[in-house]
A protein has these predicted regions:
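Metal-dependent nuclease catalytic cores that hydrolyze phosphodiester bonds in DNA/RNA
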Residues: 1-183
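Hydrophobic/aromatic-lined pockets within catalytic cores
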Residues: 61-66, 175, 197-200, 231-235
């Protein structure tokens, strides 16, 4: 077993083990899982604008302003540099106005401009100087992220959720020989905190929108799996069978290992221009501590979903192996009434 405090996100995703996302894909269909998994040799991991924005949002909320500024730089605004030479044509015009040669490639033209005036306002150089090799983010996106982060930090009882812990902690363990993995948004000494965004285009009460987001995205499976994985890691910390990778305070690690029962909290933030913030605890029992109480149905549903997906993974791995697509082996059958939603019969 491994707990890694420094693993880059790309390495985590490439690691060949079953994750919660994989379990949820399996519950859609085995082929959905295989196509999106490391087993598919033609899988493409496209770094979309949405993914880039999500990483920036997580960096700011989970790790704070300083950590965000170490990685991201706001792209300069062209309106603040009205005389900037942005295109090749701009530089040619600049050279032509000074009766200097203005033909050649962009690199040749740039060199000629700088030879004429080492302080010439070449836009590419302005951007490079301002960003210093960091990831570039537009000012409007950076402002939106900052407003969202401040909305979370200002909420009583929620603002401390992402403090006094560690962000992006990777866990690796086994379930009866099946390699598993999870990546915790934020690990505290006695709690896991997971940051989620949700949309509310239908303008439902926000608590209803959050609950539907949990159901639609099967977050209850995630809550169960993360708690289960962490408990296995903690037992290994006590017995010495869990390997610790990365820089971590020993006192913090000891506190994690000695916590009898970690709690799990989702922090939800609305993502469509209205940064509402809600926090919900995912717990096994109606009364925290579980002293003889009946488990919450949503917890049991998460447990069942996790183990159903895990069992399906093992069946498909045994039947198909890693190197061919996991096409579902189903026979044709007629529809039955229970295949359809009730509103169809109105």
């Amino acid at each position: 077993m491994i707990i890694d405090f420094n693993m880059p996100e790309s390495e985590y995703h490439a690691y060949p083990a079953l994750s919660v996302s994989g379990v949820k894909d399996l519950l859609v269909s085995p082929l959905d899982f295989w196509v999106r998994s490391w087993m598919n040799p033609e899988k493409e991991d496209k770094d979309t604008d949405a993914k880039k924005l999500g990483r920036a949002y997580h960096k700011r909320v989970l790790e704070g302003v300083e950590a965000f500024q170490e990685v991201y730089a706001i792209k300069p605004n062209k309106a603040d540099h009205e005389d900037a030479l942005v295109t090749c044509e701009d530089m040619r015009d600049w050279l032509n106005a000074r009766k200097l040669p203005h033909s050649g490639s962009k690199a040749e033209i740039t060199k000629r401009v700088l030879q004429a005036d080492c302080n010439a306002p070449i836009w590419d150089l302005i951007v490079a100087e301002k960003t210093e090799g960091k990831e570039i983010i537009s000012s409007d996106k950076a402002e939106s992220i900052e407003l969202a982060a401040r909305a979370i930090e200002a909420q009583p009882g929620i603002g401390e959720s992402f403090k006094d812990g560690r962000a992006e902690v990777s866990l690796f363990w086994e379930e009866d020989g099946t390699p598993m993995k999870s990546r915790l948004d934020y690990l505290k000494s006695a709690a896991i905190v997971d940051l989620k965004t949700f949309s509310n285009s239908l303008r439902k009460p926000v608590d209803v929108a959050v609950s539907q987001a949990v159901a639609n995205n099967k977050y209850h499976i995630q809550g169960y799996a993360y708690l289960r994985g962490l408990e296995k890691i903690k037992k290994g910390l006590v017995t010495g069978s869990t390997k610790v990778i990365g820089d971590v305070d020993e006192a913090f690690l000891e506190a994690v290992a000695n916590t009898k029962r970690h709690r799990f909290f989702f922090v939800f933030q609305q993502a469509d221009g209205v940064p509402n913030v809600l926090a919900r605890e995912f717990r096994e029992f109606e009364t925290y501590g579980g002293l003889g109480m009946t488990p919450n149905a949503y917890y049991t549903a998460g447990e069942n979903g996790f183990h159903t997906g895990l069992a399906l993974y093992r069946q498909c791995m045994e039947f198909f192996g890693k190197h061919k697509p996991w096409h579902p082996m189903t026979k044709p059958r007629p529809f039955v009434d229970t295949d359809f939603p009730m509103w169809m019969f109105d």
